Amino acid sequence: LANAAPRVDQGTYSYALESKSDGAGGTEWFLGANKHISPSASSVLALFNTAPTVWYGELSSLRSRMGELRFDGGQSGVWMRSYGNKFNVSESTGLAYKQTQHGFSLGADAPLPIGDGQWLVGVLGGTSKSDLDLSRGTSGTVKSYYVGAYTTWLDQSSGYYVDAVLKFNRFNNEANVSMSDGVRAKGSYDNVGLGASAEFGRHIKLDDGYFIEPFAQVAGVVIQAKD
């Protein structure tokens, strides 16, 4: 048998490869009842599950920018940020993998001529790359390209603020799978996503330039499925 491990990949699942004597000096091989998700199925599931964390992780640069606006009293202009994130998905979810994300965003914002300069609007764009490690020699990559628009409202006297963002993504997904017979296989697909986030909080200044910023956030994203 060419299998490098005592298992056989059969579609969605990998089955334990078992054997017994055929009674004539030979060996009979068969697939046992013990099964788990195959590397190829794991890679596809991980790639699709990663899209929301990719989308949300990219917001870290925008949240940093909006925090800067609040700290600097709403000084608008052109900005650029790089960022990095790590996510560990545990086995309890049914699919364990590690995700490492890095990317950059750039944008520009300006105050609206209403509300005494309390409102600002802006646009952003950027790209990120997420590397997935699914163990057993299987990995994946998600390259993301995005554009979006955002607005923020800040009341300087009270410190209350509202942030909102709408972001569109295009994802390039690629899987590198190590099969049970030692052969490596590759696959890729593209899909898109659209999401929005809103945050409400308060910027509370303390002595010596310190501050605290309690907030509540709600976010949602819709990811295009693929057959």
Residue ranges and their predicted role:
Residues 30-212:
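Outer membrane beta-barrel translocator domains of Type V secretion systems
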